[in-house]
Amino acid sequence: MHLSEITHPNQLHGLSVAQLEQIGHQIREKHLQTVAATGGHLGPGLGVVELTLALYQTLDLDRDKVVWDVGHQAYPHKLLTGRYHNFHTLRQKDGIAGYLKRTENRFDHFGAGHASTSISAALGMALARDAQGEDYRCVAVIGDGSLTGGMALEAINHAGHLPKTRLLVVLNDNDMSISPNVGALSRYLNKIRVSEPMQLLTDGLTQGMQQIPFVGGAITQGFEPVKEGMKRLSYSKIGAVFEELGFTYMGPVDGHNLEELIATFREAHKHTGPVLVHVATTKGKGYPYAEEDQVGYHAQNPFDLATGKAKPASKPKPPSYSKVFGQTLTTLAKSDRRIVGITAAMATGTGLDILQKALPKQYIDVGIAEQHAVVLAAGMACDGMRPVVAIYSTFLQRAFDQVIHDVCIQKLPVFFCLDRAGIVGADGPTHQGMYDIAYLRLIPNMVLMAPKDEAELQRMLVTGIEYDGPIAMRFPRGNGIGVPLPEEGWESLPIGKAEQLRQGDDLLMLAYGSMVYPALQTAELLNEHGISATVINARFAKPLDEELIVPLARQIGKVVTFEEGCLPGGFGSAIMESLQAHDLQVPVLPIGVPDLLVEHASPDESKQELGLTPRQMADRILEKFGSRQRIGAASA
């Protein structure tokens, strides 16, 4: 049987180990070819090929349910559930999603994108099953990185108190999340995976037996079960931890040995209470470049499969916002020992790896623990430090209560730097940074700012570190505009003060962050049609520069706002609230992301679909304010 013939995972039933190994080879081949062409998550899926095959051979997936944590390791799952023939559309607009989606396939039982949710979801399904008198298996597959998240531990604590609830947790232990895992639990798991004294003892005994004349080989072969028993004795400590929490513990199991995996899963399915199967895997298995660089090959842009190198860009690009952030923060930290960068398992993605290498004592990685990261920062701020929490916009949502309760109520100088704010592209709705303006703007004592380009980001970094209270800066994914970047001597910005970039009499255009340059381009298009616009770089969404904005709105009488975020509660809402508070009744056109989920596509495709290109925005402005001539029609 070929992988291309599999449309239902139950087709794996009855296949021999040799046949499964052949399908596993085909999965890796298709996985590598596709990600090399489209980009996507590489290492996670390559590491769970055998795990997926063995698990699915022992389940009846017409009835049983598997929940994959995060979802970036679920490409083999997708290939075994009827998506082989359109897998080439992975992460493309209207194609296969990079994560799990309930609406995409009936075997995607729970959507995901953020970490540590799988055990809670699978336990919920198990409790629903029992409440309705049904009979099927519920399985959560979770990585050791996700297990550092508090929600996963909360779910384990709950499940362990339900001895009659049948639940299987498969711990995919590859000693990695995106970056190397941190924390006591991860260190403990790693001790269990590689117990050096026990390894040396068993290897030494094996070598000694092999040297016995005539019978050494036979004795060595007979010693193998004893050797495995000695190793498992060294593993018993971690098992004791889970057993004390109410789980039956099985493992560690070689995550690339199909026979051992199948036997273990079959045994696990016999239990009637919560079971944890500990599977040791290698991230990037089967592709040498990914095995050697597990951080770099966690996710990849399109690359050359033969060399493992990224495909060259058509022309040199400016540095990314993340890189400018990391370099600038590191420079500032060298002269200010109060500065400490904090990340939640995203050092490379946020640019904090630059700080980590240069000033490791001023860098903290808390693991996948956003709530802890925020309160840790609050505690450090209490005692004189200047913590900088570098985090993706979408992940700060997970610590919303802590931002309010532990930072803003106490007016502590914690600086939130929100990477991937706005449209992020192929990762889809779980990762779009749409909501931070709205959910942070409503909190008292919080200051919000966003740079128009990478040079202004440098100045805002200084501003945030100097500010004696809660403050947040959002910036987009990807490369900067390409403006000159001073290497030092950055000046702070006055809090709540905007910048006028263009003078005009017909229209007031107020732009925030990444939408400033598109607003300027829109103004140029409107100027070709006889409409002159004043363009303001707002810089701050809270507080607004009302001394500048309100008189201009009163004078000009027509207002357009621009933001790369959700319109409900966002920057445009802030402007309208301000104008209303000043009893100013002028027409306002808010431009941004409407009340919908932005699906996976390239950023340019998403902006086109949302009407956020300069030409589309100019057309909307002409339509709103009375011109019948459209930009597109006029220039056709």
Swiss-Prot record:
Binds 1 Mg(2+) ion per subunit. Binds 1 thiamine pyrophosphate per subunit. Its cofactor is Mg(2+); thiamine diphosphate. It catalyses: D-glyceraldehyde 3-phosphate + pyruvate + H(+) = 1-deoxy-D-xylulose 5-phosphate + CO2. One of its GO terms (biological process) is terpenoid biosynthetic process. Pathway: Metabolic intermediate biosynthesis; 1-deoxy-D-xylulose 5-phosphate biosynthesis; 1-deoxy-D-xylulose 5-phosphate from D-glyceraldehyde 3-phosphate and pyruvate: step 1/1. Homodimer. Belongs to the transketolase family. DXPS subfamily. It comes from the Bacteria. The gene is dxs. CDD domains: TPP_DXS (cd02007), TPP_PYR_DXS_TK_like (cd07033). This is 1-deoxy-D-xylulose-5-phosphate synthase. Keywords: Isoprene biosynthesis, Magnesium, Metal-binding, Thiamine biosynthesis, Thiamine pyrophosphate, Transferase. Mg(2+) binds at D144, N174. The lineage of its organism: Bacteria, Bacillati, Cyanobacteriota, Cyanophyceae, Synechococcales. GO terms for cellular component: cytosol. Catalyzes the acyloin condensation reaction between C atoms 2 and 3 of pyruvate and glyceraldehyde 3-phosphate to yield 1-deoxy-D-xylulose-5-phosphate (DXP). SMART domains: Transket_pyr.
